[in-house]
């Protein structure tokens, strides 16, 4: 009792220290004093006295330290806080905070019979000073804000003012902070919004903040935030349009995953609305989404998001009353019109919405009207299937499959059968569009989910079997996916729909995406892991006998569908089978047969009558499968040393016997490959004879059994033996002084046998071409690799000899081998540069030396010779140049060529164009330009000046090349046309590279001006040759241009970005008088017309047309002259441009 009285008396100006101490004790968790308990125990009289004292104290504090002075003190900074005014302000704020805390606690103990006028006055005062508080007083602001929220929630007098204050403060804070707590608190007092008058000017700031909430992720993601946003639609009917406009403007930046939340906001707003608000939401928002869902282009980033919103409403129609009727009413004026629109994309968009929303009906309609409406919609489905636009037909297929799957029981059987026959009987064989055929097989699995469809589909689907052989990969993929679905749902036996023979033929030849699916389809048929292992072997033999190549592909992907242990078991099961076949062939079973061997014989008795070692194809197939299976689990076996050792030992024990029995080359190759998986010590007799076998091969032999032998030596770490062999065969600079002494290596190679340089080149090329073997080769001693490089370099002297000596024979390599050796020399030098790049440009400099050799020896020789002499040696010098350019292109592509190397290469390319007749190098040169254009961004060490100089040279090389091609057109039109068509791909890639990496740079503008000059010159030349003005009709299509221009412009219009840049440059050329005169300007008009007729129409066409039109007007005086070609061109071009600009 005494404590309560003491507390009440402490609320005064004289005892303010004690009052503050009481409040402080309440804040300390360790102290037993509780302000809430104390207030709850106060009598009515004590409460009223306390509240009056609080009001008096608050008034006194504010009179002594007015709030407007606080802002001044705050502005003067922290130093001013130490002054008398600053300390007084601090004390005042502390007292007001304590008063606010007591008032906040008092709200919960207010009784209606009590007089709380004094408390109300305190709340009004605190509410009034809230906005005037300095920014630094967040603690007091928060406390007063909590008081306003609590006062609003209790519904006490003046709650509108406190509610508005709390609403604004929470709204502002929720947008500034990233926590969701303020959003939740704002939702609790969202009714306070209706205290604001929408039409008053003071509500402007509120509107802006509320609209900002619609693009705030915290509000969109949080449940309370979405509830709050949906309630804002009910504030004022005029605010709805502002909300919808804000959301539409932000759609492009919102993630697609958030669209379901946006749709939920609209849906909740619609569900709660009534009267004019409901009408506005439906007409201004939902129907607006419907309109844009139909009319927005598919490529628009907003289109898919609009559809997400509409999908949400479509899915709600079955669970929420009124949605179905609303969709029917809102779609009615726009959807059916969209389905009949002339624009095919609009029809396609409308079809998508129609299919998703089907059936679109008003549940309030009478049965007869409802049936009529549904019948009309089925007719729309039929019309979609017959639409001339493939995308609409594809959407129709989707609709038929979704609708029949969902409403199978309710649909009339005749309609059902007719629709499915249309899909499977006609559209599955739509020759005009692979997308339509693909849609059939992508959508049919939807119907399979309905078990009632299985009997009918079992009759219809076998007619589609040949779709497995469709010329479109995506159709084949979709067809196999459908077969997988049939198998999964057990709708039918998949081999009755598509016979196994067809499946195996596709498995043999098809691409990886199709093959992997086919393996998944037939996996359990040929590797039934749940059955005994002898069955695995039987199925394996069956598959090999049915289709050898398909068996290889099947087991190549088998490891993806079962455990590695099963693959290892299958390897040994096949080994048991081969062992049993050999035993039957020799008819001498071992006397002391082990228990395991007994099991082996038992396992394969089923195959006794069908399998024999004399069946070479089957034996080879089984051996190949062992190799394929071993390769597929090689990495897994590395982690299971015990299993790997067991497998090696088992095969090591039987391989000698296999080599004796299986003597056919088809069997030898997989046997050699098997040995390459094992260490040399496991097969010592064979490993010792490999190098002798390689040495004894004849040059020019067709078979490639040497490949597996080389693989063996590389896997055994014996690449040094190969190097010794080829070193003895390759010519050297001191060939005459070569000693006949045998090699000091473990394998002795004698010189009594003839040298075989061409075979040496075959071996080296194989090692360099295959990554694993190349790695082994490059890990050989550096000295041996350098010696090999030197030996290959002797090919240069042979090539010089072939060119310079009429009918002469090379000293080392033959005429056929010399270019090959030269190519290997170049390739090896680059591989060595990559391997030892940390040591500088040791090997790259060798390639640079090769470039100097090409320049000084080959190009200078060509320049000095007569045409007749060069014809005899054309093949040789073309091979040299092609080899050099190919290797240099690869050097730049992998980033080994620095700025200096690239610059030398470009200069050398100019030399080749000036010296060599013919254009065999053009494709390679364009590839080089493309790579340099891209690599100039990667070389970070180059200065800006070096890069600019390099790109300038790129542009010069390109210009020179195009000039050479243009000259060839004039001299030999047919040859020039063939050349240009052959280089379309690299030319397009080069232009695209320049466009994507160097837009609005000198090289970009230079390349485009070169591309402009060619067509302008050719078209101008053609126009000048015309004698009859009737032949001067403007072109309507690309095919109307002359051949050179047709090729170049055809490449330009493939890319919309290139078209825009090309038009910008054309405009600049016209404006700067680079293109001048009536004839050249007419040529520019022809180019503009062709681009405008293409698929990448650009707004820039009008800009260029206007510029050309202005230039043409400067030649207006020609209309005063007599009839001439130029006058006709002027009038025709002016008329054409006028029509274009006014269209």
Curated annotation (Swiss-Prot):
Alphabetically ordered keywords of this record: Cell cycle, Cell division, Disease variant, DNA condensation, Mitosis, Nucleus, Phosphoprotein
GO MF entries:
bHLH transcription factor binding; histone H4K20me1 reader activity
Entry-annotated residues carrying Phosphoserine: 30
Task: Provide a GO CC annotation, any one.
Answer: nuclear speck
Where does it localize? Nucleus
**Which InterPro entries does the record associate with it?**
ARM-like (IPR011989), ARM-type_fold (IPR016024), Condensin2_G2 (IPR024741)
Q: Mutating residue 609 to E leads to what result?
A: In 3KS; leads to defects in mitotic chromosome compaction and organization; increases the number of micronuclei; increases cell death
Q: What is the effect of changing residue 693 to M?
A: In 3KS; leads to defects in mitotic chromosome compaction and organization; increases the number of micronuclei; increases cell death
Q: Where are the HEAT repeats?
A: 460-498
Q: Tell me which residues bear Phosphothreonine.
A: 805, 1119
Q: Name one GO biological process term.
A: positive regulation of chromosome condensation
Q: Which disease is it linked to?
A: Khan-Khan-Katsanis syndrome: An autosomal recessive neurodevelopmental disorder characterized by multiple congenital anomalies affecting the ocular, renal, skeletal, and sometimes cardiac systems, defects in urogenital and limb morphogenesis, poor overall growth, microcephaly, and global developmental delay.
Query: Which PANTHER family does this UniProt record tie to the protein?
Result: CONDENSIN-2 COMPLEX SUBUNIT G2
Role, per record: Regulatory subunit of the condensin-2 complex, a complex which establishes mitotic chromosome architecture and is involved in physical rigidity of the chromatid axis.
- Subunit structure of this chain's protein: Component of the condensin-2 complex, which contains the SMC2 and SMC4 heterodimer, and 3 non SMC subunits that probably regulate the complex: NCAPH2, NCAPD3 and NCAPG2.
Query: Which protein, by its recorded name, is this?
Result: Condensin-2 complex subunit G2
Species this chain originates from: Homo sapiens (Human)
Q: Which gene encodes it?
A: NCAPG2
